[in-house]
Swiss-Prot record:
Entry annotated with the keyword Lipid biosynthesis: yes
PANTHER family from the UniProt entry: TETRAACYLDISACCHARIDE 4'-KINASE, TETRAACYLDISACCHARIDE 4'-KINASE, MITOCHONDRIAL-RELATED
Gene this chain is encoded by: lpxK
Molecular function in Gene Ontology: ATP binding; tetraacyldisaccharide 4'-kinase activity
InterPro entries in the record: LpxK, P-loop_NTPase
Stated name of the protein: Tetraacyldisaccharide 4'-kinase
Stated family: Belongs to the LpxK family.
Amino acid sequence: MALADRLLEAWYRGHPALVLLRPLEALFRCVAQRRRERFLRGEGGIYRAPVPVVVVGNVTVGGTGKTPLILWLIEACRRRGLRVGVVSRGYGARPPRLPWRVTADQSAGQAGDEPLLIVQRTGVPLAIDPDRPRAVRALLKEQPLDLILSDDGLQHYRLARDLELVLLDAVRGLGNGHCLPAGPLREPAERLASVDAVLHNGAAWDPPGGYAFSLLPSALVHMATGERRPLDHFPPGTALHALAGIGNPRRFFATLEALHWRPIPHAFADHARYRAEQLRFSPALPLVMTEKDAVKCRAFAPADCWYLAVDAVPSPAFADWFDAALARLLASS
């Protein structure tokens, strides 16, 4: 097990040795608090875009289902006739220059796996740059837009925002409640009180002060042909290899089990870069992976290789809240 995986295990399941990291946690909390206070005072060269900005992010380390929810938000905005752009840090991407406009024909190595997935699914204008204000300016210079979605960036305070949406895993929650490196929190837990909405991935119903959303499988997609098959393409009890290089691979494996298949799990690091030989498993069985992994593996995927398409389904209460929030933003912009 890699060090990152060991830390995640300790943060979310507990480990007595983490107490040794408390002094570093105190330093981290101090720095995080000072950065936020500077933002609240309007210091540090904050950029306010001429259109509303909605930040979708995390206060925890580890996967929360952010990309599927962003896809849902894009479509929700489009249903209102809005022209939407997306900015992202582009973690792991190696573009020739920054900011970089992502297109559907680029490689994941050039564009980043999550940005490429978003563009391939939606065709939305998307720019990657660790300097998010610069990415926003590049998109707005290129074409007129009504709204910007920031993929992650909750802690990137140089970009002013009009709405903050935070995602939590309903099972993992806030882990041990401590900040990095003694726990999984990027900011103290009280930060949740200042955001506009908290969405709980996997919650059965809307928790107090938050909203539920689920990731529902919709189809199996063949990697080579793009053919979509219904979920009963593999009958119950089918053994298969399952590959996931995401923030929370266990959730993906549990989803396959809930579909009554028998996955042999192969977990990789989040944003892993794959080679063809890493996809050759024994015994010879179908291989099913996440869509995020598929954008990196399509060129060398084995013959019987599929990805599981999933869709974010927020609670009706959140859908109504977001629609009303958009109306307020547009009326005041």
